[in-house]
């Protein structure tokens, strides 16, 4: 059974087409990721699925309920952890969770038992009676998630759950999400612009770009669909000739999806070991000193580039102001 179904969703904010025919489904008990740069439409999709925004057209079902026709039913089925926390920072972690339970009609011993279970599960039992303002960034996000689980939802939406966390706190959060998926028997839909996060956590991934889903599947299948290897050549001083270096590599037989990231020229080739001598020789012949060269199997970054023709990191940076303006 599908826990989430999105069919041809469209949403426009003034001149910005946020969703342009988004369709996908999430199986019951699955961890599913919407992966894309800032401004791609991920958060708008989640806002539609959580009844916070009505689509201009299309249909969405969560737990078998239509989000537009029966929003109250949907709200009882879901937990939602937004990018911006809804925690009362002057209350304790426990008080925040108790309030959430009461909002959902819970009370007495069952509510207190549930809160205690979740505090233990997310590693906040020892900090439960501290004012939330004093929590670290990672603790605050774990409290957000615990609050979203108080009423035992069937589906949990995590919108950019690790944004703003340092790498160590992000890794801890990944472990927590994996544990929650197992112990709570949840369907989880998470949005992220971290490639490694989607690769680590999701059973299936939908890559979102400019309001559309361009491809979806398991991370392994998506990467396996790209033949060959990625070659990265870091250049030394180039005297402003980076575009010329890209052109040099583009002319080589077998070099595909050649692009520039800073001073690094990246390309996809059938065989890295065979391609590297040709690339180095061509660059040397045009006076480009090379600092380093590496090869790697295809990544989700390569998948994004292949299906969109755009570099993930560059587009993520380019659309940060747009995301702040309309997607959140």
Residue ranges and their predicted role:
Residues 58-69, 74:
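Conserved ABC transporter NBD signature motif
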Residues 98, 102, 109-127:
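Conserved ABC ATPase "signature" region
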Residues 131-135:
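Conserved ABC ATPase signature
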Residues 152:
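Conserved catalytic motifs of ABC-family nucleotide-binding domains
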Residues 156-159:
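Catalytic Walker B motif of ABC-type/P-loop ATPase nucleotide-binding domains
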Residues 175-270:
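ABC transporter nucleotide-binding domain
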């Amino acid at each position: 059974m599908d826990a989430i179904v999105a069919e041809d969703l469209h949403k426009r904010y003034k001149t910005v087409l946020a969703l342009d025919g988004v369709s996908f489904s999430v199986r019951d008990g699955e961890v599913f990721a919407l992966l894309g740069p800032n401004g791609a439409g991920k958060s708008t999709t989640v806002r539609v699925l959580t009844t916070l925004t009505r689509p201009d057209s299309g249909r969405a079902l969560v737990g078998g309920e239509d989000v537009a026709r029966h929003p109250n039913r949907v709200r009882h089925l879901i937990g939602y952890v937004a990018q911006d926390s809804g925690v009362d920072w002057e209350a304790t972690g426990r008080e925040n969770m108790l309030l959430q339970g009461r909002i959902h009609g819970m009370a007495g011993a069952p509510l207190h038992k549930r809160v205690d279970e979740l505090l233990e599960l997310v590693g906040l039992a020892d900090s439960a009676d501290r004012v939330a303002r004093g929590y670290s960034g990672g603790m605050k996000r774990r409290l957000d998630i615990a609050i979203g689980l108080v009423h035992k939802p069937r589906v949990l939406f995590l919108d950019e759950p690790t944004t703003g966390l340092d790498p160590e706190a992000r890794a801890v959060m990944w472990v927590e999400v994996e544990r929650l998926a197992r112990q709570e028997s949840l369907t989880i839909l998470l949005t992220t612009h971290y490639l490694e996060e989607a690769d680590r956590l999701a059973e299936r991934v939908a890559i979102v770009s400019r309001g559309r889903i361009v491809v979806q599947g398991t991370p392994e299948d998506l990467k396996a669909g790209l033949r060959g290897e990625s070659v990265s050549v870091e250049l030394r001083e180039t005297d402003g000739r980076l575009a010329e270096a890209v052109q040099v590599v583009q002319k080589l037989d077998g070099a595909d999806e050649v692009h520039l990231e800073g001073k690094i020229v990246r390309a996809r080739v059938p065989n890295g070991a065979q391609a590297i001598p040709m690339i180095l020789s061509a660059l040397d012949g045009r006076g480009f000193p090379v600092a380093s060269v590496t090869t790697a199997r295809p990544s989700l970054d390569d998948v994004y580039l292949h299906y969109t023709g755009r570099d993930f990191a560059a587009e993520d940076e380019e659309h940060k102001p747009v995301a702040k303006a309309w997607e959140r």
